[in-house]
Amino acid sequence: MDSRFFIVFADILLPLLLGMALRRWGLSREILRMVIKANVVCVATFLSLVSFWSVHVTKELLWLPISIIPICFIPVLIFYGFQKNRFQNPLDQGSYMISMMLGNIGTLAGLCAYVLYGEKGFAYVQLIAVPQILVIVLFCFPMAQRFYEMGAQRTMETKRTSFIKLLLTPNQLPALGVAAGLLLSGFHVERPQAVGTLFTILIHVSAWMGMMPVGYDLRLGSVGTYAFKLWPIFPVKFILLPTVLYGLTTLFVTDPAMMTCVVLSAGAPTAIFAVAAAQLYGLNVDLAESSFVTTTLAFLFVLYPLVYWWVEFGVM
């Protein structure tokens, strides 16, 4: 088996374990916050710029950002149609819905796409991941606030960050990196070879910088409490969404790499943003963390190997 297959496991599981160890060793949370900021503002922006520097805009490429709509909102329809009453407490319901709809696309699906297709695959996935930021700000945060108010049984005004402040933050700089990379590609600016070499190194650095703080905040004791109660998330994320998105993508796309990147993004496990939203809006954090851990393990040990062999054996 190609050694590239194991890169994803090393870049996801090892920094998670390191983050947990750093918490035990008493590392300051402020240091981890600086790591997060440096990753988003500097490293992720550079990776977005460089990966899109080599992408040529086509009509098929336009489907990638549009595909985030069914990826995120099919789970919402399923939640309201079949799953809302699975939990009675609105704080549980809010965490459950957000855990079902948000995927770890930018980091985990992006890393898998890079292993399979190089910079091109990473760029394709980022075109799907960047619009998810808008979904989080425009839909997830307001819905989290709504479930919080329902759970608190009151509608008193609470101090929340304004929409403009949520949207216009340094966390959105990778989107500017995408735009800058596309401009450089459009004007046929030659990319230095050293930039590609640095990209190869930094994509792994970015994964470690992104997952280490997650491990630092993770409380494994919460995982077992909700693990079996969250089973409906698994067929939605790992069977329904990849199947539906593959079918939709074949209507607009002929490039096998794009198809695979959409499938990886559709099957991405619960995003750490789901945990962050639960923390920010007072929802059930334990439920969101349980979904994050269990779906991430299922993705790494089931879906990712299937997609990897699917590509390696020439099906795609």
State the predicted function of each range.
Residues 1-316:
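Alpha-helical transmembrane segments of multi-pass small-molecule/ion transporters
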